[in-house]
């Protein structure tokens, strides 16, 4: 097909150990060639195709995880994107659990990335959905943390496992002492809350 799933590795910084991967969709367009998510995801969010794309990615990732498991890599997690449209779908929990059960995988092998901006749309419903997903065993990651919105308030209310820092937030860290201090504060806060931290870039 025109869509493929690529895996971007995640490394543990203290020992450079491969700790997992992030699944990213790529579109090989017949006219325009290889397109990155930034070039087509906004369009898919508008026309509703994003839910079909996400489900395709989830299925492909679970299929790959099962193949890796058979080769002895049973503790290798993969992060997948969950769009705002998916989050507010009434059957997302049932759909995700059915996919991991189909491939006989533990839910914690699938890390679900939810953007920080999703919190501002309907925080009450989002918290309910995320709580249900965590109860089922999925690992919840907040993507693009620090990109704005009510970051600290969200941390106080959202049942999450991982903070994924926004790239702009990290890049600006090198510019000014104040920004470095803010970054260190966020990392220290995450540690106190027993959250893992992922830095993009």
Where are these regions (language model features)?
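The catalytic core of metal-dependent phosphodiesterases that act on cyclic dinucleotides
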Residues: 97-173, 185-201
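Catalytic core of bacterial c-di-GMP phosphodiesterases, primarily the EAL and HD-GYP domains
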Residues: 13-22, 49-126, 200-201
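Catalytic-site/binding-pocket detector for metal-dependent nucleotidyl cyclases
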Residues: 2, 48-49
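Active-site core of bacterial EAL-family cyclic-dinucleotide phosphodiesterase domains
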Residues: 1-43, 81, 142, 199
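Residues at alpha-helix caps and immediate loop-helix transition turns in enzyme cores, especially N-
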Residues: 19, 36, 91-93, 122-126, ...
């Amino acid at each position: 097909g025109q869509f493929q799933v690529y895996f971007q590795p995640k490394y543990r910084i203290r020992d450079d150990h491969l700790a997992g991967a992030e699944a990213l969709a790529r579109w090989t367009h017949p006219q325009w060639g290889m397109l990155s998510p930034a070039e087509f995801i906004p369009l898919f969010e508008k026309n509703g195709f994003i839910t079909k794309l996400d489900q395709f990615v989830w299925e492909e990732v679970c299929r790959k995880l099962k193949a890796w498991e058979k080769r002895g890599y049973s503790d290798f997690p993969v992060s997948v994107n969950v769009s705002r449209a998916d989050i507010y779908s009434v059957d997302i929990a049932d759909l995700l659990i059915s996919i991991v059960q189909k491939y006989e995988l533990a839910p914690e092998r699938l890390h679900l990335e939810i953007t920080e901006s999703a919190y501002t749309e309907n925080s009450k419903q989002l918290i309910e959905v995320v709580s249900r997903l965590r109860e089922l065993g999925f690992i919840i990651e907040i993507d693009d943390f620090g990109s704005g919105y009510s970051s600290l308030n969200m941390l106080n209310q959202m049942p999450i496992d991982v903070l994924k820092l926004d790239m702009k937030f990290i890049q600006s860290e090198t510019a000014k002492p104040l920004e470095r201090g803010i970054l260190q504060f966020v990392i220290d806060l995450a540690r106190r809350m027993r959250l893992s931290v992922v830095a993009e870039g």
